[in-house]
């Protein structure tokens, strides 16, 4: 075996878009449901791990075999999730040097960063199945307990056998579509230097950055206390039920002789230059509330892994054609501005 194309379907109660794949795969309830693969471009097989099937020994061995190149669309997801599946400790991941990402290849050719989008632009015969989004929502995320579902918080294969069969077909089609993307782009290879940069990028993302969680949590707590104090001061000054309401604040200002169409940052700064008291004080308090933002600290708290490090902060080739990386989660490139 020289190459192994992989696509997996997973379950985790952690919100992937908010916490990133590293934290997502650390969730105690994380598991790989389906493992779709093709060895050396051969027939696609789907291993139903959720229903008790096991990876064939040769496939399991290939995951750590440096002689086998592993391919996936957004390979970072598969690599990190499979690292947890194989029982590697937090902070240890499968070697990115053994992986290639067809999403990076597509981006280098100016194609969309989604498998569905890339397949559509390339006009592939086997497109990504559109029903996948609903199936992922059904099987891969927690569900709300209702009378209709007997109060369960997770949908399993036995709860909808027909949907599960469709989900397996979806998984197989993803592998086929990913291989079709590779085949279509084979005449336009990515320079080896790009794959070397990709490996370095993955090592940086795997290593992450240590966070001072005491500082993070205290900053969030201080912000909450400050917002309570500022809001209380505004209520006392304006006698409004909700002084944070733009409409209520604009009406209060108008009733006190100060008309304005907007309470944007620049508009408030201009109004403060001429506003009489107590209008000036109210605008000053509102400006302080607007400045108070700890979203970056909240993002840190959401994304931090069990060992106190935040990972997956950068996406390689986040911008098509130019190849510029893109910030993710905490947006660390903005720290000097914050």
Which residues does each PLM region occupy?
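Active-site-proximal helix-loop-helix substrate-binding element of RNase H-like nuclease domains
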Residues: 27-37, 41-186
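Conserved "right-hand" nucleotidyltransferase catalytic core of DNA-directed polymerases
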Residues: 1-16, 27, 34-36, 120, ...
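Cytochrome P450 core scaffold surrounding the K-helix E-X-X-R motif
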Residues: 13-17, 46-49
């Amino acid at each position: 075996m020289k190459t192994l194309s992989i696509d997996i379907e997973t379950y985790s109660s952690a919100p992937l878009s908010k916490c990133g794949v590293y934290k997502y795969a650390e969730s105690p309830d994380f598991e790989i449901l389906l493992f779709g693969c093709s060895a050396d471009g051969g027939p696609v097989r789907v291993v139903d791990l959720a229903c008790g099937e096991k990876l064939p020994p040769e496939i399991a061995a290939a995951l750590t075999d440096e002689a086998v190149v592993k391919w996936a669309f957004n390979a970072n997801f598969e690599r990190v999730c499979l690292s947890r599946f194989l029982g590697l400790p937090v902070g240890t991941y499968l070697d990115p040097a053994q992986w290639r990402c067809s999403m990076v290849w597509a981006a280098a050719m100016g194609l969309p960063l989604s498998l569905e989008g890339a397949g559509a632009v390339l006009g592939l015969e086997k497109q990504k199945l559109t029903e996948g989004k609903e199936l992922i929502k059904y099987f891969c995320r927690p569900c709300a307990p209702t009378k209709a579902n007997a109060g369960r918080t997770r949908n399993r294969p036995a709860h909808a056998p027909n949907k599960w069969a469709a989900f397996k077909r979806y998984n197989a089609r993803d592998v086929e579509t990913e291989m079709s993307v590779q085949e279509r782009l084979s005449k336009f290879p990515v320079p080896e230097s790009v794959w070397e940069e990709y490996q370095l990028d993955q090592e940086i993302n795997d290593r992450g950055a240590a966070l001072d969680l005491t500082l993070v949590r205290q900053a969030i707590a201080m912000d909450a206390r400050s917002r309570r104090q500022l809001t209380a001061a505004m209520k006392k000054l304006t006698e409004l039920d909700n002084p944070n309401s733009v409409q209520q604040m604009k009406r209060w200002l108008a009733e006190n002789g100060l008309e304005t169409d907007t309470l944007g940052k620049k508009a408030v700064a201009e109004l403060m230059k001429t506003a009489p008291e107590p209008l000036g004080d109210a605008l000053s308090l509102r400006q302080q509330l607007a400045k108070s933002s700890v979203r970056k600290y909240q993002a840190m708290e959401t994304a931090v892994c069990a060992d106190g490090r935040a990972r997956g902060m950068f996406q390689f080739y986040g911008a098509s054609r130019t190849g510029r990386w893109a910030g993710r989660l905490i947006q660390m490139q903005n720290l000097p501005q914050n």
